[in-house]
Design a protein with these regions (language model features):
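Sec-dependent bacterial lipoprotein signal peptides
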Residues: 1-21
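Short, charged, intrinsically disordered terminal tails
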Residues: 7-9, 23, 130-136
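Bacterial Sec signal peptide processing site at the extreme N-terminus
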Residues: 18-37
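Short beta-strand/turn micro-motifs at beta-sheet edges
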Residues: 23-27, 56-57, 119
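A short small-residue
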Residues: 33-38, 72-76
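Periplasmic peptidoglycan-binding/anchoring modules of Gram-negative envelope and division proteins
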Residues: 42-71
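Periplasmic OmpA-like peptidoglycan-binding domain that tethers envelope proteins to the cell wall
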Residues: 74-136
Length: 136
């Protein structure tokens, strides 16, 4: 009675095809930050900001298992409540643009508004951060 070798032969026949598979799209990427700057007292994305968000979305699509984290910043000089509100609006604008560019909203985590002494300058306080990959 002949032995059944079909499963083993099937696996051997598939090896040349599997050897050419590119698994990099499934691996976790190095953390990649993107910094988006806004006009004072604004959460509107200008052309340069949209380009940065589009670049972040493209990178996120290459690594579909990587988390995407968004943080909005606000200028503490305008008061804590107003700065927190602006930071949330900026984060929301980034999330909206990322999803419009094809990033699944379920992958995007929004960090609490960043307001306070850790924001060293008014320019730094007028930004939003997008990090694709694990946070450092």
């Amino acid at each position: 009675m002949p032995r059944r070798r079909l499963p083993g032969l099937t696996i051997l026949a598939a090896l040349p095809f599997l050897a050419g598979c590119d698994l990099t799209a499934q691996q976790m990427p190095p953390s990649h930050p993107y910094f988006v700057f806004f006009a004072p007292d604004s959460a509107a994305l200008d052309g340069a900001a949209r380009t940065i968000v589009t670049d972040a979305a493209a990178y996120a699509k290459v690594y579909p298992l990587a988390p995407v984290t968004v943080t909005g910043y606000g200028d503490p000089a305008v008061g804590a409540a107003d700065a927190a509100r602006m930071a949330r609006l900026r984060a929301d604008a980034l999330v909206k643009e990322l999803t419009a560019d094809g990033v699944d909203a379920k992958r995007i985590a929004v960090r609490p508004p960043a307001v306070g002494a850790d924001v060293a300058s008014s320019q730094a306080a007028r930004r939003g951060d997008i990090v694709v990959g694990l946070l450092p």
